[in-house]
């Protein structure tokens, strides 16, 4: 089973693109897409539920369920037509981002049983129905491979057009760990990532870093490898003022952004100190 993890907040204008991208995946295996709304203050929760109620078998008691918890409301069901597609909707009651609270404990019922984890935030989306199948085929074929990523289109929120592409290489192949480290967290687009859920020995300094994707990319590159597919399967939205990267590149110096910068530096310092062989070889 594959678990797709989608965190979203105040993305009512964009979330339907993400949901459609999840639902259209054609796979030979079941996929549970976990959509976590972090107590949005716009109309996003209702947009998500309307889509869910329209496209999923919410009255099929053999699969579907709803649950009220102290932290949020949960909705789970199978897609009416795509029988390998399941949605788990979690509408949080309180905003966890502002409180620096982890959402991971709430995802264990779906994530723990998954062999692979796919990532896509609420303002990004997938464009190819074979995206997941092709990613998983690589992971199944290459036992040492820890992560797969791909070329990604860049959609300008200001201009409403595709303005370019984000790519790591000009052909399929393994990424050099040096490039993964030196080129930073944007070298690999989050919405293109699928990784093995069985990551053993994930270091503490990576778990406490507030830029979660970047240390995972580094760890996977150094422990098995990251394989790159030179084909566009997804869209990364740029110039979105409500996203973290939009705030980051617009010069927003909020406490959270400063904390992310600080913990990223701490993570890299810890990596260099614990990997002297890599440093001596000039790899980082």
Regions found by a protein language model. Name each.
Residues 23-90:
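Acidic donor-binding segment of Leloir-type glycosyltransferases
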Residues 150, 167-252:
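Conserved nucleotide-sugar donor-binding catalytic segment
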């Amino acid at each position: 089973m594959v678990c797709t993890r989608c965190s979203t907040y105040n993305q009512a204008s964009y979330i339907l693109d993400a949901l459609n991208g999840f639902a259209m995946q054609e796979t030979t295996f079941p996929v549970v897409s976990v959509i976590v709304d972090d107590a949005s203050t716009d109309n996003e929760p209702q947009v998500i539920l309307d889509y869910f109620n329209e496209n999923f078998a919410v009255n099929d008691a053999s699969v579907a369920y709803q649950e009220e918890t102290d932290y949020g409301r949960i909705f789970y069901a199978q897609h009416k037509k795509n029988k390998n597609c399941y949605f788990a909707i979690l509408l949080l009651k309180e905003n966890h981002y502002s409180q620096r609270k982890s959402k991971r404990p709430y995802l264990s019922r779906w994530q723990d049983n998954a062999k692979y984890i796919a990532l896509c935030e609420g303002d990004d989306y997938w464009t190819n129905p074979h995206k997941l199948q092709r990613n998983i085929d690589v992971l199944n074929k290459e036992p040492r491979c820890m992560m797969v990523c791909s070329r990604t289109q860049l959609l300008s929120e200001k201009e409403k057009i595709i303005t370019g592409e984000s790519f790591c290489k000009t052909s399929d192949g393994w990424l050099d760990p040096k490039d993964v480290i030196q080129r930073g967290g944007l070298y690999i687009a989050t919405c293109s990532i699928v990784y093995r859920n069985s990551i053993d020995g994930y270091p503490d300094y990576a778990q406490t870093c507030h830029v979660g994707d970047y240390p995972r990319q580094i760890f996977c590159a150094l422990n098995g490898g990251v394989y790159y597919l030179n084909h566009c399967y997804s869209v990364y939205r740029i110039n979105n003022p409500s996203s973290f990267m939009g705030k980051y590149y617009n010069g927003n110096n909020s406490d959270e952004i400063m904390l992310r910068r600080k913990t990223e530096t701490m993570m890299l310092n810890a990596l260099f100190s614990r990997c002297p062989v890599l440093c001596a070889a000039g790899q980082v």
